[in-house]
Amino acid sequence: MLEFFNISHAYNKQQILNDFSMKLELGEVVSLLGPSGCGKTTLLKLASGIEKLQKGEIKINKEIVSSSNIHVNSEKRDVGYVFQDCALFPHLTIMQNIFFGMKSIEIEKQKNKIQSLMIEIDISILADKYPHELSGGQQQQVALVRAMASDPKIIFLDEPYSNLDSRLKEKIRDQMLHILREHNISALLVTHDPEEAMFMSDKIGVLNNGSIEQFGSPIDLYLRPKSAFIAEFFGEINVFEGTVEDGSVNTVLGTFKCSK
């Protein structure tokens, strides 16, 4: 569905991504987790076509959409994007925001689906209101519906809950996951919140220094972290010094076999 091959990218000679590779399957929700500045949002911008790729290759449905000499525009990639700040047009009504940029024939085709989605998440009564009349949670719900208006196969979610309080975050998160599952839409979520990643994801990719440190299921990363860097993302850890000898490590707690 979505494939990254050996992606490298820099801003003003500062390397952001370094030989990054990853694959997202149809219907999967994958989270990118990592510290600020590790390249998470840059990956979304490259995959969605907002930025041009410097080195490597990105495929959607097995077709190259980005490489050093190929760039398919965003509107031709069959993707949706939910921004951290919603990015709604303040001078347009909610319904106008949702259908912005779509042709009349596309609007007619998608109208019933969009209205059903709005009813499902309880925002149908907001159709004629303007963004400033909505709460932060309602604006984020509108942003999700807008991202789905063109019937995309992949949705990119850039820290969509970061500006919401914890109670509202849980509600919106549940709604979003339900809709993604119901419509079998793949999603790539950027977050710095490990709890959010564990709840939402089929797989998690932890980034460090511009590349994948570990990629796998939430339970895999939690129970079998490959490094202290990974373990620290999912809770407090105790670090013990030891010496390695004959395939085992000797610590104050005893001797343990080294993992392969």
Walk through the language-model features, giving the residues of each.
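Conserved structural motif at the start of ABC-family nucleotide-binding domains
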Residues: L2, L17-D19
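Short beta-strand immediately N-terminal to the Walker A/P-loop
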Residues: V30-S31, Y81
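The feature captures the beta-strand-to-loop junction immediately N-terminal to the Walker
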Residues: L33-P35
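Helix-to-loop junction immediately C-terminal to a conserved catalytic motif
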Residues: S48
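Conserved ABC transporter NBD signature motif
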Residues: G56-S67
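ABC ATPase nucleotide-binding domains
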Residues: D78-G80, Q84, L88, T93-F229
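ATPase nucleotide-binding modules
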Residues: K226-K260
